[in-house]
Structure formats: C-alpha cells, structure tokens
C-alpha cells in the first residue's frame, strides 16, 4: 500500500533531466501495470524524447507548467487536468518539460509494470533501450549488426 501524498520517491537524471519518480503501483504491490507519480523541477525535462514498442502510456497533468513534445515534434502546453494517451510506435513519441516556475507533477500509467519488458526508441540520440526484469541496457542504433553475424551453423 502507498499514498500519493507520501510516496517513496527516487531522484533520477542529470542536469536538464532532473526529476523525482515514485513508482506508486509497484509500491502498492501491482505486478502487471505501471503507475508513477513524477515531480519535475522548473527548467528540467522528465526524460528524453522517446517512444515505446510494447507499452502504451497515458499521462495525467496534475499541475500547470508542463509542456509536451509529441510525435509531430512541436512543443505545446499541457494544462492541469489534461489526460493524453501515447500509443505504441513512433506516433506515440513524447517528452515532458517543465517550463513553469514551480515544480510540476504528473501521473504516468503504462500497460506494463515500470520494471517490465519493453523496447524504447530514443530518436534524438539514436539509442534503443532494451528493458526487462533482468536487463536494463541501451545501445546506439548505428551499431546494428546483420542477423547472421557471429552465427555458426551446427556441425554433424
């Protein structure tokens, strides 16, 4: 059990991407859905622009001050109370940034747990993230290899 007014936050990020995240569904014992409460300080982005291959995501703006960069690439205000869905694939690309003067909060709800399996594409930096319970790895997409590279056929 957890409470949105007193969740266990983890501090994440680097300059420009500082954020606090509480994985409230996980803290409450959920195993197949992800719900996180995010707190984004002024001038910081919650995360890089990205889209998911497996998980669909919904964001609920709890405060004013957030701006959304969607799949079209343009920034727009995300007013308090707005609920927006991000489908899987490039059309679900998104990034949230706090352009306000005070900390802004939002909820994210995903079709998979926050520590679940997903593949995430980061087009701005050319990375691909592979995530599961045991794997949290990011790779540059430019280093893709041929399907058969390194494979040896069985010998009799």
Model regions: which residues?
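A short, N-terminal "cap"/entry segment at the start of jelly-roll beta-barrel domains
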Residues: 1-32, 121-156
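Conserved short histidine dyad/triad with adjacent acidic residue
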Residues: 19-21, 36-52, 87, 91
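A short beta-loop-beta micro-motif enriched in histidine and acidic residues
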Residues: 25-33, 44-58, 72-74
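Short, conserved beta-strand element in jelly-roll/cupin
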Residues: 37-41, 52-68, 109-113
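Short acidic-glycine-tyrosine-enriched beta hairpin
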Residues: 72-89
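Ligand-binding loop in jelly-roll beta-barrel domains
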Residues: 88-117
């Amino acid at each position: 059990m957890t409470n949105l007014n007193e969740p266990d936050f983890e501090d994440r990020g680097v300059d420009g991407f500082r954020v606090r995240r509480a994985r409230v569904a996980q803290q409450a014992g959920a195993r197949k859905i992800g719900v996180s409460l995010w707190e984004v300080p002024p001038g910081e982005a919650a995360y890089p622009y990205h889209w998911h291959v497996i998980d669909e995501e919904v964001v609920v703006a709890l405060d004013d001050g957030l701006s959304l960069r969607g799949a079209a690439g343009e920034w727009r205000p995300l007013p308090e109370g707005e609920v927006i869905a991000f489908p899987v694939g490039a059309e679900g690309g998104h990034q949230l940034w706090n352009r306000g003067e005070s900390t802004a909060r939002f909820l994210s709800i995903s079709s998979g747990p926050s520590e679940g399996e997903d593949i995430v594409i980061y087009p701005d930096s050319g990375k691909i993230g592979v995530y599961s319970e045991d794997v949290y790895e990011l790779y540059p997409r430019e280093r893709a290899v041929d399907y058969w590279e390194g494979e040896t056929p069985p010998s009799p």
